[in-house]
Design a protein with these regions (language model features):
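N-terminal DNA-binding module of tyrosine recombinases/phage integrases
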Residues: 1-44
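N-terminal core-binding DNA-recognition domain of tyrosine recombinases/integrases
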Residues: 26-124
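Basic, Lys/Arg- and aromatic-enriched nucleic-acid-binding interface segment
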Residues: 132-161, 270-276
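A short, glycine-centered helix-capping/turn motif at helix boundaries
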Residues: 153-166, 243, 247-252, 283-286
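Conserved tyrosine-mediated DNA breakage-rejoining catalytic core shared by Y-recombinases
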Residues: 166-203
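Short functional hotspots where side chains directly engage DNA or cofactors
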Residues: 179-184, 258-298
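Active-site/catalytic core of tyrosine-dependent DNA strand-transfer enzymes
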Residues: 197-251
Length: 298
């Protein structure tokens, strides 16, 4: 076995130790809080998407380190070159979010925290996000008619791509107040019933009456990969978030009167914390600032 293959094997062996597929990261963090521990210390890789992403980062790191430092013999030898690798990626223009992901990937492989490498990660600013920026409405994205049904379901449910691909007819139910609810199977093992965007309740009901299903992994699912727009669907989740905020604001029974005041380039804007929490819950998030900075910023 060559040096590169040997070091890669050592790395993958460490990454495999972090696998916690089928477990819930959300529940693990809750358990940590109840035990009086910092939830940020919860370790493990809870999804195959994250695992595969981390593998790609680690393989890239190993390949570049071996090329630049012929003296390394083991994966442990490579660790001191992590700051150099990350700095090189920063110099080449990788975003602060991507650099943080790279750090998390390598931290998982080395069973440490990403800040333990001694690299000074750049600060993440909302204004620097490029995904879906310059798009005023998801109606202008993937305008082809063939995406109309998928876009309607995405804006109705607020699903991430992986969540949408796992939707079944039985994942929808009538709520007591006349709305619809959707069962989302999301990141980190979070599974919950969420509100369907009331703007699309009638249209979604009609769709579900005749919707075709496809056998995937022993389930009858509503969408195949090819039936969802290939471009980012984040802006459709943003549409969902903004519609839900307006819905809860109009309803009047969710607002708490406690105000979230925006900072930075959103200085002067404010949102009710009770409504933010409700929107965050239905997006399968857990932090109000994420909802504001990534979904309600327009």
């Amino acid at each position: 076995m060559g040096k590169k293959s040997n070091i890669t094997h050592q790395c993958l062996k460490e990454l495999n130790k972090q696998k916690k597929f089928g477990e819930s990261k959300f529940e693990a963090k809750q358990a940590a809080r109840k035990a009086g521990r910092n939830s940020a210390t919860v370790r493990g890789i809870y999804s195959t998407v994250t695992f595969n992403s981390y593998v790609r980062v680690c393989k890239q790191f190993i390949a570049e380190t071996i090329t630049n430092h012929k003296n390394v013999k083991t994966f442990a030898d490579c660790k001191k070159y992590v700051p150099e690798f990350l700095q090189d990626k920063e110099d080449k223009g990788l975003s602060a979010w991507t650099l943080a992901q790279y750090g998390s990937a390598l931290a998982s492989a080395y069973d440490c925290q990403k800040n333990d490498f001694g690299y000074d990660y750049p600060v993440r600013h909302r204004a620097n996000i490029k995904r879906c920026r310059g798009v005023n409405s998801s109606d202008y994205r993937s305008p082809e008619e063939r995406w109309d049904t998928a876009k309607m379901v995405l804006k109705a449910t607020g699903c991430r791509r992986t969540e949408a691909l796992r939707l079944r007819k039985e994942d929808f139910r009538e709520a007591t107040n006349g709305n619809l609810e959707v069962f989302k199977r999301g990141k980190g093992g979070i599974e919950r019933w969420c509100l369907v965007n009331p703007k699309y309740t009638g249209e979604l009901r009609e769709y579900l009456k005749t919707a075709e299903t496809h056998p995937v992994s022993g389930e009858n699912r509503l969408f195949l990969k090819a039936q969802l727009p290939q471009s980012s669907i984040h802006d459709m989740r943003a549409d969902y978030a903004r519609d839900l905020y307006q819905y809860f604001e109009d309803r009047g029974d969710v607002a708490t009167g406690k105000i979230y005041h925006c900072k930075g380039d959103m200085l002067g804007r404010s949102f009710d914390k009770g409504i933010l929490s409700a929107v965050s819950y239905n997006l399968q998030h857990s932090r109000d600032n994420v909802v504001v900075n990534h979904y309600l910023w327009k």
